Swiss-Prot record:
It comes from Xenopus tropicalis. InterPro entries: NSL1 (IPR026180), PEHE_dom (IPR029332). GO terms for cellular component: H4 histone acetyltransferase complex; intracellular membrane-bounded organelle. This is KAT8 regulatory NSL complex subunit 1-like protein. The lineage of its organism: Eukaryota, Metazoa, Chordata, Craniata, Vertebrata. Residues 748-862 form the PEHE domain. It comes from the Eukaryota. SMART domains: PEHE. Residues 423-441, 652-661 have a biased composition (Polar residues). PANTHER family: KAT8 REGULATORY NSL COMPLEX SUBUNIT 1-LIKE PROTEIN, NON-SPECIFIC LETHAL 1, ISOFORM M. PROSITE patterns: PEHE (PS52052). Residues 319-343, 419-441, 652-676 are annotated as: Disordered.
Amino acid sequence: MTPALTETVPQGPGAHLAPSFALQSLNSDTIICMDNSQAVEHISLPKANGPKVADKKQLLKTEFMNGNSIGSQTSGHYQTVFLLTSNTALSLPNKGSSTWKMENQDVCKQRFHITKGSPSLPNGMSYQPERKAKRELFPGCVSQLLADVHKLWDVSLTKTQGTEGICLPECMLNGHRGTESLAVSSCPSLISHVSANVPSVASVKAVGTNLLLKCLNHQQVLLNRARRNQKRLQSYLAQHAVQHFNQQIRAFVNHQIHDKPAGIFDSQPTKVINNNLNVGSSGISSATSDGLKNGVYHSVKRFSVSAKEILKQIKKDFDSDATGSSSDEDWDEKARQNSDECNAERSWLSVRTRIGSRWVWLQSQISELEYKIQHLTDLHSQIRKAKGTLKFEEPSKGNFKQKLWLPDSEMLLSLAERMPKSPQGTNPSPTNDLDMSPSSPTLLLRNIEKQSARLTEIVSSLTVPLLSPNDSAKSSVYKRVANGFSDRMHTDGFPSFNEFCEQQVKRRKKVRVKASSALGSNLCSSARTRPLQALKKRKLYKLSAEYSYVNKVNLFSSPVYQYEELPSNGNHCSTWKCSKVLHRPWLMAQNACEADSCFHPVLSFPYELPLNVHLAALPMKNHNIKGNSVDSIALRGELDKSQSYVSASWSTECTSSYSPDPQTPAHSWERRHRSESEADAALLESGLTTPVSTQKSSAQQLLAHESSSMVCAARRRLRSGNSYDINNIVIPMSLIAPTKLEKLKYKEIITPSWKEVVLEPLESPAHDMPEDLSDEAYISRHEKYELKEKARWSLWDHSKRPKRNRSSSYSFGTSPRTVLLSCECSCSPNSQAPSEALPSDTGGYRTLHFSHESPKGKTIHWERRVFPLTEEPAMELLGKCPSQAQVSTVDNQQCPKNDCDYT
């Protein structure tokens, strides 16, 4: 079984040979010679017994020594002639016929001249060019040689076959047109014969159709056989190419053996011939690298590289297991079935993958939608919980026959009657002389009256009546509840609430009189005119008890409540302070947070403000209360009295408690801020009013407590005013924009410069004495200089202090520049005071006087020195201190002269 060849359609001139092919299976019945000339290549057909070996070697030697004919890749224009033997002819059916035998003999003796522009095989003859697409690996002439396989020749098959007396003379496959054409022609005599035998036209058409189908089937069989023959031909051509390479190499080796001395090829050249092409080509190239000329060497190298690549590709592509190719007649059907199965499986996998991905996407979308639905449901439930629920009374069945059920005014005012009322704040009962018939318009007025009664109830729950001093303790302990909120925003002794209640009663009387005289329309049962039975607003945010407790503690401890409200007793009852500050909405929100834990200062809406807090702020607005002039004058007088009392008491206590030193530099600044604090305290205490006649003692205690707290606040502010914190300074951008930013100029610190000293080699002394490294010697050596440096530093530090502290740090009569201190007093143990020091006048060197108790001196510019000190300045300094000089002389007597440098 001959392995088939898988071909691919190349982009340019060239062909690709497939699977492995053993070199031992190659036969030499055909010799393929390559030439670069324009003439037709000559391929000699070997005889039955084959040519002589000498002739072969001579021919190969002649061809191989031609440098341009081996491995040439420059020329693309050449012609190739294939002389096919009998085993490569097309095996067509009906081999026993005379026509087939003649054609077979003609094919065996015919030379096919194939040029580069020759037409290719028809589409039906090409071997599945779409199955594989491999990159082109063949170089030059070999690629062109193998590329002409699929461009062989126009196949003309002529066959005559008689079927039921009808002759189909010709079945033409024309490769020039690239299409399959079937020419069915019949002789007139045959047609007349058929028409004579066939009785009807329908039978003639049926017979013609059957014959046409048979012809097409036969044509398909022929095409399949042609494909198989083409694959066999390709395999033979691959064998010829491999054999050609072997012959070229053998001829070259024999040529080198005959022409060169035998010493060069001591490494068994026959082994090189029998080995694989890779080893042979590498051995040849390494063995002949020194003997060949440059041109021949490059040609051999190119030839070896091309042959190596071609054989690698042949060995790779001719593997029947990898390619699935076979020369069996059923190979096409099996390959088609396998390809169909592979395609079906691939399509099924792709569809399954697509469906799976789509299913996953749908699942994710469904889960996302479910999450959104759940989120919207929760949000809807929260909105419904937060939304107030309105309950209206049931409308009457007959608007004009049956009266609506209305709660009695006494029932609505029962809660207000239970609360203690002022004698002037009595609420008169509604008029009883009005007509109560259903057609009367007074029912609408009664509804208005009941709504006003409810407002009266709310206001009465917020007001504090004037009680006796005996009842004041009970009222202070009692905590009222209004609208579900604890009322802790008021105390008992506020006269403006009673005045406000009296004015509201008068207004209700006026409105009632006007409404009784006005004409009303008939009563209807719409929701707009139906009485409101209940209103309940749920809070969306509910805070825990721990947060409310912490919030209350923070509110009382925060600086906001230091001026608005302060706790007066253990029950956290507080008093309104400043009316101007209470009108701010954020303060109302803070008070609402204190009164009700459900109210949040940020998250809650303004309309969720507790009603008692909102109504408690209304009486403090003087421009909203339009009362009698007498009441306002009296109230203003009481306010003036309380304000004067508070300001006087606070000012006396403040002056007695704090009296700054008049000699301090910040005296004027503190006095200015004290006047400002007094004005602020007077403004804060302006809102505090207490009834002088009823609760004078409690008012005095409260004023004393408030004044003490104000004094403490003023002290803290004055104490913090002396310290400047850069982080707490706030400058408006309007002041910064037109100004230019100035950079701080830092003064450079003058450091002593270093002097380069030429190092001289020290002569080793005759008698080396050990140096005294004890602590006492070190201290005695350096104590004097340390004291001098301390004196200099302290005087420099005093001179660099700010200007505002110079008057306090120095005395009035002396200046820091006029003080001269001597180092002798600071160094000698007999010096007790600065006055006992005597300045020394030696050598123009200015000495310093230093005292640890009163460092008020200023240094005069001293001489610049270079450290370490040399011998002369050291001796000069030692001479200025007698005691140290004596010690140094004693040391110098004990040690050599060179040891003095260490001092």
